Amino acid sequence: SSDAFTLVEEQVAYWVGGDRIATSLEVAGWTTFEWLHFLAQLPQSLTTSQLAELDQAFELTSSGNAEIVHQWLLIAIRNDYLPTRDRLERYLLAIGRRKLVLPLYQAMAETADGRSLAMNIYRQARPGYHPITANSVDAVLGWSE
């Protein structure tokens, strides 16, 4: 409901504004949709210490929810948050859904370091992807056999 999303937005504002630390945010009982909304409402640019605080408080890197991990990894890639690198690789090797893997490769492809990482992961992951997914990632990375 929109009321639930308003409460999520309040928690983001408290944290971003420095009024509350992550562990004091009211997140008990949040659904996947509320967590996704929380992650979507975060500022585009976050520091390593801010990301570490969120990760330690909410265990986002180790979440078992593919959608939540997807959003978290996008944020991590955008902000060059290195502690998620192993999880990113495991995720891209385990998940084959185009809608979950393509945006991650696109985000990595925006920087030279990211593109290099993407190519290394993709070299291993590509054989397990559906041909449509592989074709999409091929185009993003300029992949050729």
Description of each model-found segment:
Residues 1-145:
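Long, ordered, helix-rich scaffold segments
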